[in-house]
Amino acid sequence: MPEVPADNPTTTFATIELKESAPLQAAFHQTTESENVLSMEDLGVDFGYIHYQTTINKAGKQKLIIQDLRDYAVILVDGKQVASLDRRYNQNSTTLDIHKVPATLEILVENTGRVNYGPDILFNRKGITSQVLWGNEKLTGWSITPLPLYKEEVSSLSFGQEIKGVPAFHRGTFIIEQQGDCFVDMSQWGKGAVWVNGKSLGRFWNCLLYTSPSPRDSTS
């Protein structure tokens, strides 16, 4: 048998400042209007994210219920992030206090992956696969936008002033002086995805590190 190969050389880079941002809506390309919510599969999308938007016309403090959420949702009201829900913990509702109507409700849902075995393989559509309730009232009149975030879509984004507090795209530039394997430390972030020079590096949560495969020169 051949000898075990030597470890790849490693390198490092300085802290990257992400001072440029693009709004989530910059990646919107094909929005579908529907009376009821639609799943990713209904729109011919297999992976990524899907954005739902509708209007709440009844003020008050009550539960927003997302039936059959798959898999992770960020909820915004009038452009402000107010809650998140995670299917892994059987979370499907949150209490909101709506003072002013009409209020714009946005739900950004992430497809976190699929199973390929067991009985759940038959019930594995992604997005919101049933309905959304505001109290006992079914919400209708949805604008639905799939966000598969293909390479060309991400690479063509126009960046500007920094955006904080809501889902968005952020960009920074760094230089690798010496080729080698390295890590992108996202421990101070929440949840999202990383691209290097337009190539998808992977998704992250705040407890994970992602390996960057020997980037060279100036990257963003």
Language-model segments: what does each one mean?
Residues 47-55, 165-174:
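Short beta-strands within extracellular/lumenal beta-sheet-rich domains
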Residues 80-84, 199-204:
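Surface-exposed loop/edge segments in extracytoplasmic proteins
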